[in-house]
């Protein structure tokens, strides 16, 4: 499932993460995040995987493009 810039911004918002926080969690530069979210360039497949993994580890589940479009939701945390 390709990560969309809008999903990236939405996932960061749900996690209350800055671009810098995501960059640190994924091991990429903040400018990579900024340029991707502003539609300046696409991500390399390996970078996309790192971002998705960082979101999943933090509890943000990326939803594929379905009837209502792609999305993001937070996973339930165990009590």
Segments predicted by a language model, with ranges:
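A detector for short, charged/polar N-terminal pre-domain segments
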Residues: 1-3
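Short basic helix-loop element that most often maps to the first helix and adjoining turn
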Residues: 6-21, 76-77
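Short alpha-helical DNA-recognition segment
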Residues: 16-34
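DNA major-groove recognition helix of helix-turn-helix/homeodomain DNA-binding modules
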Residues: 27, 46-63
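Helix-turn-helix/homeodomain-like alpha-helical modules used for DNA recognition
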Residues: 60-79
């Amino acid at each position: 499932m390709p990560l969309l810039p809008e999903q990236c911004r939405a996932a960061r918002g749900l996690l209350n993460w800055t671009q810098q926080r995501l960059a640190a969690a994924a091991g990429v530069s903040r400018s990579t995040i900024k340029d991707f979210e502003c539609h300046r360039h696409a991500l390399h497949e390996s970078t996309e995987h790192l971002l998705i993994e960082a979101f999943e580890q933090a509890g943000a589940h990326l939803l594929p493009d379905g009837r209502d479009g792609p999305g993001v939701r937070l996973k339930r945390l165990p009590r």
